[in-house]
Amino acid sequence: AMTVPVLSAFSNAHPKVTLTVLTKKKFAPLFRGLKMVTVISADFNTTHKGVLGLYRLSKLLRNTQVEAVADLHNVLRTKILKFFLSGIKFHQIDKGRFEKKALITGKTKTPLRTTTQRYADVFRSLGFEFEIDSPSFPAPKQLDTAITKELGAFSNSVIGVAPFAAYASKTYSISKMDQVISKLQKESKVVLFGGGANETKQLEAIASKYSNVFCVAGKFSL
């Protein structure tokens, strides 16, 4: 989701350049409102599973006549794709792991570049200059009646919170997150997003404590 304002800013600065986003099918709706953006859905559980599946995916990407790749993940899968897509400009995000480690260990207090800034840096390294200081977003869609029924009227600000991550080291403790939510809900409606069954139970427990907090984990899709 954090890539959306970056891609929007890119398209505004380079309206003649077509972007193709490679992502999982469940995330494809996030990009539906962006100009000059198409989506290729990857299925890493079946068609594109394993090295052979990634090779199959690389052939699909070559057939789109892609001229350059901006890797905004820099994980094992994309490193393998980089190998299969040799000959095509392929620039990867610098996640700043050393800078982050230095910050949390107290070795430095230098502010870190945000993830969205790092996303933009990848495109700049490919020769596309643009700024993200004033991001724009796609126009909001009409909410489904099931959503308005679940959450009620949106008379004040709404804050979405997704406290969980794929790795425990990237997850803020649920007790501390509860404290954050308790403060946020005093002035804003808070909507909690989750993951699996265990995470959903924890979010529902938090939501039950506050009248202005709602858990939608497992209830809606994009």
Feature roles, as predicted:
Residues 1-222:
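Catalytic machinery of carbohydrate-active enzymes
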